[in-house]
Every structure is written in structure tokens, then in C-alpha cells.
């Protein structure tokens, strides 16, 4: 079964082909450099660029496969930027009508979970940690159709906090890779972490308090005319994030006894978080780095998981 997938929920335009869980081809056009000058994604600009980039990708895919051989067309239906999602939907719907193929709209967040299983089989029950710029969730998967969000952020997403802290430290955008690189160079020197937040929900997150702690540290240094130690603040910020996620995962593993644990989402590319994750369980699934950010292959993999049992 050959699945063609489209991902356009945010600022990446991505096409992919998957044949029975074997990746055939993927191409993603990112808009990061364009949005960097604005300090974040501008929805209207993102939509316009999706229209332009999809035209390029359509020409590319025609050179990869006889499109009549496609069995299923999948696209990201939700969540995401409304305009960006609509561009992907229109293209998917048009191709489905032209080729007379089945079409399925899928959830972007579910796709991230299955990004760790591209070319692999899922082991249920699985405990997934989704960490990205827009979402932070703990999800327990008992099967492809039986899953429950057992915890989620009550305020900022973890990737969002990385961007805000990086901006306050004048590091640039996106903040995650920049802070992670500082951590790699300094974590043996700076081992402390900030206060770990507490939430009413046992498995919920609250990242805004960590962000506020960092901002207060910076503002206090500035008010005293002290030099801001960017390396120390960035490193101890990441130490805090890693410890916070680790505490939640350890508690959830003890309570639910999953057969495997899964890390997914854009922040899953973070070196420190990946290293921590491997220490938690004997069966650990992480996406390859090319599949950590938004991509169509994860949507194709989700479609394969859903559709192969319902054919």
C-alpha cells in the first residue's frame, strides 16, 4: 500500500511517500529563515508560502512516482494554523478527486507520536511524551484507537518557553537548538537547576514558572548592573527542563507500566532530553532527527497504522 501524505499545519510544507511502512521519499520546504526576522511565525505569510512551496513539491513528486500508483492520500487536518491547514486540504482533496483515491484527514499530534515508528512496529501499551513549540503532552496509548492524554501543559509549551528564554538572552530564533548547544558546552560546569514547578494535576506541566524564573534572574542582574552569564542561565534553564520532564516520566512509568516509551515533537531533537530518555526504560523509541520537526512522513505512518486494519 503506497500512501502519499501532506503536512502543512504550521510553517513547513512537506510531502512524503510511504510503502507499507517503508519510507520511499520525503521532501520538506521550511520557512524558518523567513519568519526568523519577525521572531516567530506570521500566519498570513505562512499560508502564502505554502501555496508557492506546494507547487514546487507537486513537480518533485511527479518525478518520483507514477501518481496513479498511490493507494491512499493523507493530510494534516488539525491542529494548526487555519490558513496553512486549508492549503494542504485543498491539494489533498483535488488530488483525491483527480486520481479517484481514498483520502483521510489526520491529527498532527498523533502523527508526531508515530514519527518514532517510521519503519518500525509499535509496542502497546506505549507512554508518549510530546514536546514541541505548541504542545506538551503525556499520552498513554493502549492501541491505535485507544489513547488518553494523561497530562499536558497548563500554560506555555516547552518549545515556546525555549524561544522566549532565548529571546530574553538575545540568542536568536528558534531558541531550542541554540540553548541546547550552549548546554552541550557547559553542562559539566553548571549542574544546578531552577525551582521545579508543581501543578494540581499529577501529570500536568507548567513551564511558565520556569520562564519567569529565568526572566527574573536576568532582570535582577540588569538592575544591579551585573554582567549576565548567558551560558550559566541557559544551561541551568535546560537542566531544569530535563529534570522536570524526567520526574514526570518516571512517575508515569511507575503508575502505568508501559511496554515502551516514546519521545516525539520538535523538542525531541534536543540532545539532553534524548539522553535522559534513554535512561528511563529498556524499550525507548525516538524519531530520527529528520522526523522530529513537522514532516509528512509521520502523517503517512499514522495513516498506515489507521488504514491497514480498516481496509
UniProtKB/Swiss-Prot annotation:
Substrate binds at residues 130-134, 163, 176, 180, 270. Its main location: cytoplasm. It is found in: Cytoplasm. It comes from the Bacteria. Fe cation binds at residues 108, 112, 294. GO terms for biological process: tRNA threonylcarbamoyladenosine modification. One of its GO terms (cellular component) is cytoplasm. It catalyses: L-threonylcarbamoyladenylate + adenosine(37) in tRNA = N(6)-L-threonylcarbamoyladenosine(37) in tRNA + AMP + H(+). Required for the formation of a threonylcarbamoyl group on adenosine at position 37 (t(6)A37) in tRNAs that read codons beginning with adenine. Is involved in the transfer of the threonylcarbamoyl moiety of threonylcarbamoyl-AMP (TC-AMP) to the N6 group of A37, together with TsaE and TsaB. TsaD likely plays a direct catalytic role in this reaction. Belongs to the KAE1 / TsaD family. This is tRNA N6-adenosine threonylcarbamoyltransferase. It comes from Metamycoplasma arthritidis (strain 158L3-1).
Amino acid at each position: 500500500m503506497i500512501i502519499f501524505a501532506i503536512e502543512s499545519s504550521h510553517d513547513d510544507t512537506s510531502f512524503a511517500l510511504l510503502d507499507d511502512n517503508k519510507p520511499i521519499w520525503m521532501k520538506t520546504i521550511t520557512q524558518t529563515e523567513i519568519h526568523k526576522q519577525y521572531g516567530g511565525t506570521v500566519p498570513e505569510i505562512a499560508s502564502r508560502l505554502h501555496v508557492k512551496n506546494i507547487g514546487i513539491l507537486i513537480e518533485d513528486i511527479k518525478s518520483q512516482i507514477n501518481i496513479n500508483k498511490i493507494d491512499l492520500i493523507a493530510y494534516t487536518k488539525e491542529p494548526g494554523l487555519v490558513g496553512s491547514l486549508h492549503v494542504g486540504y485543498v491539494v489533498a482533496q483535488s488530488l483525491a478527486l483527480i486520481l479517484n483515491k481514498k483520502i483521510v484527514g489526520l491529527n498532527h499530534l498523533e502523527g508526531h507520536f508515530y514519527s518514532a515508528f517510521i519503519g518500525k512496529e509499535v509496542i502497546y501499551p506505549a507512554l508518549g511524551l510530546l514536546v514541541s513549540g505548541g504542545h506538551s503532552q503525556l499520552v498513554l496509548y493502549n492501541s491505535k484507537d485507544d489513547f488518553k492524554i494523561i497530562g499536558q501543559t497548563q500554560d506555555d509549551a516547552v518549545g515556546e518557553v525555549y524561544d522566549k528564554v532565548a529571546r530574553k538572552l538575545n540568542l536568536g530564533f528558534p531558541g531550542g537548538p541554540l540553548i541546547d548547544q550552549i548546554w552541550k558546552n557547559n553542562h559539566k560546569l553548571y549542574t544546578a537547576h531552577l525551582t521545579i514547578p508543581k501543578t494540581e494535576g499529577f501529570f500536568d506541566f507548567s513551564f511558565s514558572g520556569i520562564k519567569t524564573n529565568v526572566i527574573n534572574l536576568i532582570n535582577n542582574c540588569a538592575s544591579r548592573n551585573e554582567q549576565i552569564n548567558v551560558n550559566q542561565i541557559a544551561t541551568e534553564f535546560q537542566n531544569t527542563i530535563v529534570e522536570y520532564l524526567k520526574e514526570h516520566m518516571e512517575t508515569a512509568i511507575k503508575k502505568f507500566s508501559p511496554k515502551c516509551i516514546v519521545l516525539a515533537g520538535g523538542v525531541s531533537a534536543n540532545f539532553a532530553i534524548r539522553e535522559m530518555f534513554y535512561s528511563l526504560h529498556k524499550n525507548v523509541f525516538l524519531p530520527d532527527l529528520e522526523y522530529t520537526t513537522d514532516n509528512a512522513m509521520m502523517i503517512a505512518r499514522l495513516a498506515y497504522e489507521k488504514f491497514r486494519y480498516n481496509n
